[in-house]
């Protein structure tokens, strides 16, 4: 590593020269850095806006799932079976699916060796269970904080290697040399003078592990503080893929946490409170049959994400009813674990569907109030909220229908390299998932992508530019950064208000319920803001410049994602996945408003992906066919020969 302070067009900029850089300190970021180091690329650094920020460190659920190849029991499984299953969820590139499947076991075993306590039976088998969108029992878990444990174990190993860390650095621009990455610029969030504000990283192998676009919504399960950097990549010319495909689900508002699994299976009471303080048990108002209502709540535990296929008569009607109470009737919505639905002293368990009854019976939980059943079935799920200041024995839990995961993201190849040479994207920032994905598959994908990217970089290393050329290459981008600072610096600040306003509108127009006409008008609104941002956005000090650049990235991401949704809607495509597109035709759930009328997609576009390109305040879109699942395998001697020559890394 070489560090110098340069004058670039009269601006003072710190420069750092590296062979490779990882941006992001979550599970995927740490894994990428470790894989680079273990592949003998040691002139590296990890850059993060906050070492303890990020989704993988700060999220979980009642039993957070990690998805991997089956390693228990007598049911057949294979790399290709797993790849085919991942591919089958629609709009998935087969080479990514095969790579995620083939890397599943080595990445999982690595985590076990690093100390993540995935359970085994007395014979050493890694026991599994079936999760959502899982045809087998590939799921496993280390408890409510699986991804946090992963991150901490990876961090401990990372720190043992003495790899450099630049903390408090926000990615603001990617520098290009033609169609290749030449470096990137960060903002020092602690800087209080212009000459310490920006750092130019002279590096042509960049692994972006900055997570999903967490900052574009208000109702979000993503941890506060994590916003993502996809807008920075879009601005540099990185292509987006499957940007319409998200997961939305019920989650608590404070703290931000999925209320999946046991939180639903213990059959809590759903309550909304209107402006006069009156309580409404709105599920009981909608369902004519109490047994069907309770069974739907139970199913919501393992059918957690909102699924448009289950919106008419399935468990996802609950998501829509919560949405109506919160977003249309402007009521706050709560889960009450202190009282049974209908305020019953004892529930009529015989009214439950067989699956729900048998599950609760096997768990010895056919008794008491929801909190009693929770303590019986999964007391750590209670302890988790208690550790965050919420006692479910004493208070209700506010919830909403929240953005939880972006299945799309930056388009990458089979080595997780974007269309910008040298820019690799791993973790949720990468768009390797499709319309659906199994629960926990994102954690596997993050580890697999990190390993693949690091391996490719180690075999095709792009050495950094000579510093003088690097400075010249970055000149326009450096000036752009300083010009933005000059434009938004003022004697007052409106950053907070602008962020809240736009994220609330994103919830309303570009969330789980999407009206094509409203999408288009919202897209135009964001575009106008972007074009005039330097006049609209104001901050009163350099200390707030961190938020100013975050809002800039947020608006770019909001525009590109909303434009993608609007493009999808205008093409005549229909409702699929975790979003409902309002239509004049089709069906709607019984007794709900016309905004919930939709036409279900029949899968005719499952073998296509929609690609987005952002440039100069415009979004262009094109469709390409998915890459099929490769045959893989091969004649051993031939594969071995190639492996000895080039590691089969090409």
Regions found by a protein language model. Give the residues of each.
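Glycine- and aromatic-enriched mobile tails/lids
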Residues: 1-18, 35, 51-58, 110, ...
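Core beta-strand elements of the Rossmann-like FAD/NAD(P) dinucleotide-binding domain
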Residues: 15-18, 193-205, 419
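N-terminal Rossmann-like FAD-binding beta1-loop-alpha1 element of flavoenzymes
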Residues: 18-46
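Short hydrophobic core segments
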Residues: 21-23, 200-211, 424-425
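Conserved N-terminal glycine-rich FAD pyrophosphate-binding loop of Rossmann-like flavoproteins
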Residues: 49-75, 81-84, 247-251, 257-267
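Conserved redox-cofactor binding core of oxidoreductases
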Residues: 107-196, 209, 252-256, 260-263, ...
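Glycine-rich loop(s) and the adjacent beta-strand/alpha-helix scaffold that form part
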Residues: 205-259, 440-456
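An anion/pyrophosphate-binding glycine-rich loop and adjacent beta-alpha core
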Residues: 239-380, 456
